[in-house]
Structure formats: C-alpha cells, structure tokens
Amino acid sequence: MEKYFNKTGYLFAGNAVFVEELYRQYLANPNSVDQTWQEFFADIKDNNALLNKSTAKVIRPNPNVTKALLNNNLSYEGLHNLKAKEMISAYRRNAHYLANLDPLGLEIRKTKDELKLNIEAFGLDSSQLEENINITDEFIGTWNCKLSELVTKLDKVYTSSIGVEFDQIENVEEKNWLYTKLETEITFASEEKRSILNDFVEVECFEQFLHTKFPGAKRFSIEGGDSSIVAMNKAIDLSMNQGVEEIVIGMAHRGRLNTLTKVVGKPYKAVIAGFINGNVFPDELNISGDVKYHLGYSADRVRANQKIHLSLADNPSHLEAINSIVAGKVRAKQDMLVDTKRSKVKAILLHGDAAFCGQGVVAESLSMSPLTAYNVGGILHFVINNQLGFTANAADTRASRYSTEFAKIIAAPILHVNGDDIEAVLKATDIAVEYRQKFSKDVVVEIICYRKYGHNEGDEPMYTQSKMYNIIKSKPTPGNIYANELVKSGIIDNNYYAKLKEKFKIKLDKEYEQAKSYKQESHFLGGCWKGISRTRGKAAITGVNKKILQDLGTKLCEIPKDFTINPKLVRLFEVRKNTLTTDQPIDWATAEQLAFAHLLCSGTNIRLTGQDSERGTFSHRHSILHNQIDDTTYIPLNNLSKTQAQYEVANSNLAEYAVLGFEYGYSLASPKNLVLWEAQFGDFANGAQIIFDQFISSSATKWLRMSGLVVLLPHAFEGQGPEHSSARLERFLQLAAEENMYITYPTTPASIFHLLRRQILESIRKPLIVMSPKSLLRHKYAVSKLDELGENTTFIPVLDEVTKIDKNNITKVILCSGKVYYDLFAKRVHNSNIVIIRLEQLYPFEKTLVASLLKKYNKAQAFIWCQEEPKNMGAWNYIAEHLNDALKEAEINNEFKYVGREESASPAVGSLQVHNKQQEKLLMEALGDDIIK
C-alpha cells in the first residue's frame, strides 16, 4: 500500500483514519465506495494483514464526523476540495502571524513553513496548483477556481496589512459574519481618497504647526499614528449613518489635541490660546484647571440632514482610568433616552499599547462589559500601538506578540492593522463599527504605528531606541505615503498634496492670530445640568410628611400573595410594618428605604450597585426578594405606584476600580438621578483610590465637572481585624478642600434619610462620602423617630447631647463621630457631668454650629476628641485645628485633647481580645470616673 501513498499526494498521514474507514467499507461491500477507490483497493494484496496492522485499533474515528465526511461518492476531487477548505480555516486562525503589520519593518515575521500554512501541510503540492477546486460557501467571492488563485486570495486577505484574531469567538454567526466582511473587498472612490488625504493633511499640519510655533512644549503628538485620527473620524461618520445620536470618547493624552480639534470640533484658536497664555478656562471661574492634553470638550457634528453629539471626556495621566467612566456616562445617556437596544449612544475608547496590556483596570472594565448592570451595547476600542511604552520596548511590557490579549476574556474580535496602510485601517474600522452596531459587543482595532518623537516633545528617544529612531527619522509620513499612492494611481497630481498643506497652513496662521485675543469659554452647566448651581445655597428641607412615610413604608412591606419569601424575611417585614404603623422608632434600613421610596415617587431615578448591594453585605437591605419556590424576583421599591421613577439595584462584579469609575461616570451624565456605589467593606475602597484621587475629589476644580455620586463605605472598629474595620476616613479628609465633597459619619437613621435626599433636593451637586454602619444597623439605640424625618426637618450636621444635663455642672465635653458614640453612651454613668456631641458631617466642618454648642458648655474644664481609629488615622489630624478654632470662636481658652488608639501602621489588631482591651481603655480614658465599672 505504501507505493500507492508515495504516488498520491492527497494521501498523507492526517487522512489515515479516513482511508482506513473507506477500506473497511470496501471489504464489507466493494460497491459501497466510489469506483476510483474500488480500483485502488483492488490492487492491494494481503487485505486482512494490512487491516490488522492499521492504527485504527489505537485511534478511533469520530462516527459523527465520519458520517458527515465520508459518503459513498467521495472522490479524489472531494478530498482535494476538503484540503482546500482546511487551508482556508488554517489561514483564518493563524495567518495573522504572517501579516505585514509593522510600518517600521522591525518585526521578524514567521514563515508559512513554521506556521504550517504551506500547501504541503495540507497534503497538496505545487503540481496541483493549476487544478480546479470547489469551495462554495466557504470563501467569499471564490467558488470554482484554481488552487493557485485561492492561495493568492488567502495571502491578499490574511497576510497583507490586516491580521485578525477571531478564533476566541464562540458564536458561529458572529465569526462567519466577520470572515465574510474581511474577505469582501472594499473600494474607495476617488473623491473618498482625496478626502482621506485631506484628513491626513489636517492632522499632520496641526502637529507640525504646534511644533514650530511652540518648540519643546508638551503636546504628546500623534505623528506616526496619524491614521488613528482619520479612523476615528471615519468611525463617527459611519455611526451617523447607522442612526447613532451621540458618541462619548475616552482616551489618554497622546493625540488628544488633534482629537479635540479635528474630531470633536473644538476651535483651533481655543487650543492655540492655551499655548499662548496658558489659560484653558475663563479667569473668573477661579479654578485650578489642568494641562491642555487632559481636557475634554463637547460639540455637535452636523452633516446634511444628520447630527451627532460628540463628547471627549476629561481625564488625568492615569492611563486607562477613563475607560469605565466613559462606559458609565454612555449607560446613563442610554437610560435617559430609554435606549434599550443601546444603539443611539455609543462609546469609543483609544488606548496605548503598553497601557492596554499593563493596567489592571482594563481587565476589570472589559469583564464588566457583558454584565447586565454595566452593558452599553459594546465599545469600539482603538489600540494605538506605537511599539513603545515611554522608554520601554514592547518586549519589556508584555510577553505576547500583541498588546490586546486582555480583549480575549470577553471573546472580542481583534483586528490588527498596519497604520501606514490607511485604506486597510479604514476597512478594519468599517468592520468594527458595523460589528458593534449589529452584535452589541466590544470590538478591538489595533493600529500598529510609531511615535515620531520621544514620549513627549522634550524627550530624547535616541538614548534608548536608536535603531528604531534612525528608521523613523528618514521615514515619510503616513500622509506622504498615501499621497504618493494617489499620484501613482492618477487620482491627484504631483502638486495636490503640497497645495493642501499650504492651504491648511494659511488657516492655522489665521487661527493663531485670533488666538492672541481669544477668550476661553467654560461650556459649563449646560444640557442635563441646567438648573444645577455651582455654589451651595440655603440648606434644603428634606423632611417628608409622616403619614406619607408611613404609607410608603407599609407599601414596601406588602408582598404579592403568590410570591413566597424566606420565613425570616416574613418576620422582618411584619416587624417593620408594625414599627411604622404604631409610630415606633425606625432603624437604618427602614430610613434608607423611605428616602429612596419618596424620591422615586417624586420622579427621581435611583441606581445603586456594589458587591452584594442587592441584599446588603450585612443582610439589612433586601432590595430584591427571591421566591423560595422558583427563580422569580420582586423589587418592592419598583412597585410603589404606576407613575414612579425607576429603582435599579445590582450586585457588581468583584472589582472596585472599574465599578466605582462606572458609577462616577453615570453620575456625570445624570445629575437629576441619585447614583450610589457601596463597598462590601469600606476597607476595600482603596482598590479604587485613583477614582477618588483623580476624579471624585478634584474633577470640579480641574475640569468643572461636578458629580452627585454617593459612596457608602461600611466603617467601624468591631474586632474584625485590619481588613474589615477601616474605610480610611483620614484619606478622604486629606482630600477635602474648596468644599469639593461631603464627608459624613452619621449615627442615626434620620441622618442618612436626610443626607440621601439632600443629594437631590439641593441645587448643587457634590460627592457624598458616607462612613456607613455595620453593627449599628441593628443597634437598639441607633434608631430615629419618624418625627425626625417629618415635615420641615433637615439634616443636622452636629448633634447635641440627647439627655437632660444641667449645663452649669458640665465638667467635660466629648466630641466624636460614628459608632464610638454608642460605646461612650452605653458606658457613661447615669447623672454624669459629661456631654457627648456628635459630628455627623466632618467636612465641610460647621465651625459656627460647633462653636455655638461649645459656648453652651463653656464652664467645662476638659474638651476631648474621641475616636476608635489609631491616632495617625481617623479624623484627628484633620479636625484638631478646626475644633480649636471653634473653641476660639466660642471664646473658650482651652484646647482639645486626643483620646483614642495609639499610632499604628495597621488600622486594627487581628485579635478580638486585644481589640476589646483597646476599646475599654479608650472609653475609660474618655469618661474617666464617669464610666460604668
């Protein structure tokens, strides 16, 4: 049999099982196989001996595959076609390694032999290249052709300037659609080609203009990656054609100035003015501002009868931090438009290669993308791969060939494209835009390009990448390359490109002259922010008629008769209902629910997410009830009335950074909604520290971007160790300045009721940081009367002593915040001469209110600040100066003394016994002889 194999190229080892199965059929019934095979097998001697030696004893064919592939009429031609189809599949999987992706030509590409993409790997040889094959329905535009023609077409599609990775996609429909689009040739009309060249000219000339006028000034040029701006422009135009009404863009600093002008539509003179006088906001706003390449902008793009609103988000230099923020903004806009198909508003994110594979928030954000609570219908990602991360080479920043491996965790299609081939870039963009709109999923286009200068224009790249930059120095620009192509094809003449550049240079010169006297505009408090104030007004009345609260609370306790809830919850709702109807004091969870309920009935949408937020980490909220019989759910807060607003509550994925960023972004686009993020424990909030530092605390003074986001951080020292005790209150207080946010540590249900409602009823929007309770959720003293939530009531930032004590007999005044109050209260003896005052709001510090209370007790000899946290943590370092200033205002010649835990590197001890001893010690020191022994 061997001699026949040697003579027949289509019989190779990979077909052993196939041939053996045919041979078995032949032995059983010679007429069951094709005549060609009958003749072949008839020449074989010693049939039984050959069969006994076959590998079929070891390797058994899949009967389903065998049945599908081996029909009675399979011939040489059929096998030949099968091999061709296998080659197509292999090209689709692996030919991206052969693609010409590097415009600098530095990459050493693999060969067909290495990748087993040569025809011999499929049991074919050069003698068969002119033979006809039939691959109907397998390869677009090719049905009956020669094998050589198929190889040529495969090489053109898969090994030219685009390399694709679609194998991670499980959905067959999506995968086939992508291959069809890729294998379909697209052409550009002459006018389109000239328009593309004009885009190149505007991108290139603006960068060169700034380089000449402001030498050495940082601008993070996009030169070398010019095609990314052209591609983004194309993506927007394509989106307009698909009915998209708004696009939110997020990106880092490289190429931002060109994106602001060329893409979003900011006047060139506005950007140039920032270079001339350094001002990027009107002086009268009196804000700190930010550098030019961090700023955002919004404008409408109008074309014929179409209009689309474009927004470029402000962001810091913390790469990729903007990703989930943009997603949150898009989701909020979609929700406001009731865009359930998520097709009217979309996001475009631009990433750097080193950042995309290096920053963990990328994986967090991508993982969120398909989840119901965070789905925005897919994001279009452009990865601008300039093959460097500051001074680090690609090999220093990742182990993989591509920077886009993270995208595979959500099975996103990835198209890699050579940035010097603009028509290939635009084809990839066209596929990506249509895919996102059709399948509502993320898609990635990686543009491999280069960076003309160093990390910034003052940096010298020759120190570290001399070989690369020697190539770049002599390299024509992408625009120049394309212009030469158009000249060769006769679309433009030799002078066309130069004339375009000269014409645009004249425009920029005019913009430069106008920039000298240009007055910056703020574009502040427009759109959905109309009616919101920048400054605090009179304190909002946040109370609600008691009867209304009782009715709402009772309604929340009504469960449908055919809905079976857990018996423990039955009891909980019975107790809660009885508490409300009999006018007894309510707990924290009830107060929160009542605050939500009245806001919803007043037309305010509410969104709350976080790890375990549906039930609540401490099993107190139970926003979503689960039927014990089946998997159905019931949300009481969405069943108050037919005209109420929407309550959305969701458990987040196990991430802080991206999730908090998403909710912050959501709050930026929905100032009339109450948006909350809750940490599982406050200790874990520092996983999102960048969002707190770069956005929540500082966005108003840097970018004039306000947020009303509420952050709930469970915080208290209860013997649970260093990872479940502290939300790092001190860090938030360190960030507090210019009345940038509210920082609170409330102790009563009434306080949280008013705080939540204040976020909406005030005319201003500021983030609210809440050190929320754990054990106080069920503490017998941590309750409030409904009258404290009633009409004409409001949030009280400082709570006076609750017991009747003769102020003339007071010897000591203790100020504190949070849970420690109840520890002090429980340990203080009856008829004590010590008063305990609570600061429900730590920032802004209400000095006048505190001073008025201190003056009331001006005969006291000792003034103490008591806290549970170590001395170097908690509020002490922030509040000591403020408290002493309040004493001065009260005309009391004294100072506050610290009582609390000693300084510590760790927030809390791991031993419950040690914790209890520490707690007892600080209580004894605070109360002295007035402590219950």
UniProtKB/Swiss-Prot annotation:
GO terms for molecular function: oxoglutarate dehydrogenase (succinyl-transferring) activity; thiamine pyrophosphate binding. Keywords: Glycolysis, Oxidoreductase, Thiamine pyrophosphate. The keyword GTP-binding does not apply. Its cofactor is thiamine diphosphate. SUPFAM superfamilies: Thiamin diphosphate-binding fold (THDP-binding). It catalyses: N(6)-[(R)-lipoyl]-L-lysyl-[protein] + 2-oxoglutarate + H(+) = N(6)-[(R)-S(8)-succinyldihydrolipoyl]-L-lysyl-[protein] + CO2. Pfam families: 2-oxogl_dehyd_N (PF16078), E1_dh (PF00676), OxoGdeHyase_C (PF16870), Transket_pyr (PF02779). One of its GO terms (cellular component) is cytosol. It is an enzyme of class 1 (oxidoreductase). One of its GO terms (biological process) is glycolytic process. Its EC number is 1.2.4.2. Homodimer. Part of the 2-oxoglutarate dehydrogenase (OGDH) complex composed of E1 (2-oxoglutarate dehydrogenase), E2 (dihydrolipoamide succinyltransferase) and E3 (dihydrolipoamide dehydrogenase); the complex contains multiple copies of the three enzymatic components (E1, E2 and E3). E1 component of the 2-oxoglutarate dehydrogenase (OGDH) complex which catalyzes the decarboxylation of 2-oxoglutarate, the first step in the conversion of 2-oxoglutarate to succinyl-CoA and CO(2). Belongs to the alpha-ketoglutarate dehydrogenase family. NCBIfam families: 2oxo_dh_E1 (TIGR00239), PRK09404.1 (NF006914), PRK12270.1 (NF008907). This is 2-oxoglutarate dehydrogenase E1 component. It comes from Rickettsia typhi (strain ATCC VR-144 / Wilmington). The gene is sucA.
